[in-house]
Amino acid sequence: HRRENLKLIPEYFERISELASSNPDLQFILPIHPNPEIRKHIDLLKDVLVIEPLPYDDMISAISKCRLIISDSGGIQEEASFFKKKIIVCRKKTERLASIGSSSTLCKEPNDLKESFNQYKENYIVEEECPYGDGTSSEQIVEILKCVI
């Protein structure tokens, strides 16, 4: 969905379709971004279940249940780390460097997607702790505030 990737969308969709076709044992689901510049390439997605964007809670549920994620979203990159899911980040660079090498890898070009996918396809379990925290920050803040107030 990133502007930097708009010209690459057709190539990424073709690579994703190739992965889906060559891995019939896996279900590929793509919540499609509402941007018309992305949607106009939907016909390139073969063997991929294309769905409308998911509400946040449904997206979190999908992330928690999936095996592997391919995305260019930094937010999804963070959520994937929290749920110990491997993610292939389709960008030349990311602002979220903490998870690179553990739960995420950069896929800088569409033609690199197959290699990244094959690397993570069988090796999809994340052993490392989430670099963005354990999900208890609000409770920790409340405890600190109780001591201060």
Model segments located where?
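Nucleotide-activated sugar donor-binding and catalytic core shared by glycosyltransferases
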Residues: 2-30, 35-149
